[in-house]
Amino acid sequence: MLFRSEVKPATREDASWDEMKHKAADIGKANTQSNKYDIRDPYWKLIKQNKRKIKRDYEFNINSPEFQDLKLLVQTLHAAGADVQYVSIPSNGRWYDHIGIKKDRREAVYKKIHSTVVDNGGKIYDLTNKDYEKYVISDAVHIGWKGWVYVDQQIARHMDGHAPKNHEVDYSKNKPPHKHHNDRQDDQHQGNK
């Protein structure tokens, strides 16, 4: 059995990927009732209590020294002949738009991650065009319910020998959702007037 006895699977063992994505969306919706950013409720509570940083200007730095670390990792594993598939996950686009880290800044970093992997011999599964898709991310940057289904599906493909296509993500198709109401109430609570 693949599951620990106390863990009950959310779907049947033979569920299709579409069924799993639908179930993941249901679970995500049930766990993000307290806010419009699809951030899991316990994390949102910490944000509201000012126990998590809202100002995150240090993130999405195109000149981060971590890019050299990534390059070295990809080159080393490629030279060793390792069968590695890197996964580039998005951030929560609606949340980052709200706190002032705009889409173009995030996309520049996503593109640099993608090119660093590909240009150094790596294969990448790029999910960064899903930063506005509900429940792919569970807070600001951590993979969420639906995101895990995408990753699991790609792992299964990879294990079956189906390599990802190292294509460039078309960010023009990844548009922020239309705002249906004013962010004023959230802004006032967080002191971002």
Spell out what each predicted region is.
Residues 1-80, 174-193:
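Secreted/periplasmic serine-hydrolase-like ester/acetyl group-modifying domain
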Residues 14, 41, 92, 142-145:
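Intrinsically disordered regions, especially transient/low-confidence alpha-helical propensity segments
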Residues 48-53, 88-91, 114:
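Generic detector of short, locally flexible boundary/turn motifs and exposed helical patches
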Residues 57, 65-66, 85, 94, ...:
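Long, well-ordered mid-to-C-terminal structural blocks that present hydrophobic/aromatic surfaces
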Residues 71-84, 113-124:
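A structural motif corresponding to the C-terminal end of an alpha-helix
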Residues 74-101:
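Active-site segments of SGNH/GDSL-like serine hydrolases
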Residues 96-193:
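Long, positively charged, glycine-interspersed low-complexity recognition regions
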